[in-house]
């Protein structure tokens, strides 16, 4: 076994760099590389163990360069056998249970291909061609900002998704009208390139360079829903694109878990990082005048509210020149209303 990764625990402060809070983990296998398409696959695991050999055979047939299987504890008895049978699979053994976003962050640190397809163990690829064809479709045939050939179209491309009953799932997420208890609504993509606020269930093909540049997922958020909301809002605020494609399709073998949109500390963190900052000209800031309403509505004591607000201000200041727009602009991609009106200060979020 080879132990990799930082021995740090996940920090309570908001990370400003991609990998400053990666946990410790163990890697087994993955010595071989299947191809040179530029696209690797990440397999996230939840629930019962599905037909793993069948899954890995399908991924081999698709021709992914590398396959990373993120294994929650406890480690399964057949890992050594599987790593010998499938030497292109890199088994990442977690020492503790990690959130969805933390698992994707960790997988990103384990591959060097420009594209990464995040999938679940209860999914199957239905259409889209092999890895080479999928990567080719996403190529922009332009140079990336570093002057290298092979730039890709967007931060994340979301495939069509089917239920276990072969029904098309509403995988587009759009902001809802203001003052609702729900924050997003699911729609089925009707055309190629339809925008989505975030990749549902974390599933999609990610541009690794763009992903790392925006900081990946915030590991301090434990709710998968608010991790995805934070990732999606930050991506759009910073000028990135998340869109759906109808040229790739995956199917669930069992129904995915429903999204838990409960509010709490994760919502407050999301609010401070994405909704509260004010964007002017070429930068953003979190003004002190936002603090009184945050204190009154956060249900926190003065000390905790000050600490969290100050932390949010520091994070916004450190990244202030990354902003390209404000929440109203993001909302205008789908709605005539304002996202800032729809996402109120903590404590007001459930008002009608």
Residue ranges of predicted features:
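Acidic donor-binding segment of Leloir-type glycosyltransferases
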Residues: 56-93
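N-proximal low-complexity "stem/linker" segments adjacent to membrane-targeting elements
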Residues: 2-57
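Short, flexible, basic/aromatic active-site loop/helix in glycosyltransferases
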Residues: 175-197
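Active-site-adjacent helix/loop segment of glycosyltransferases
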Residues: 241-343
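Short beta-strand-to-loop element that shapes/binds the nucleotide-sugar donor at the catalytic cleft/hinge
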Residues: 147-172
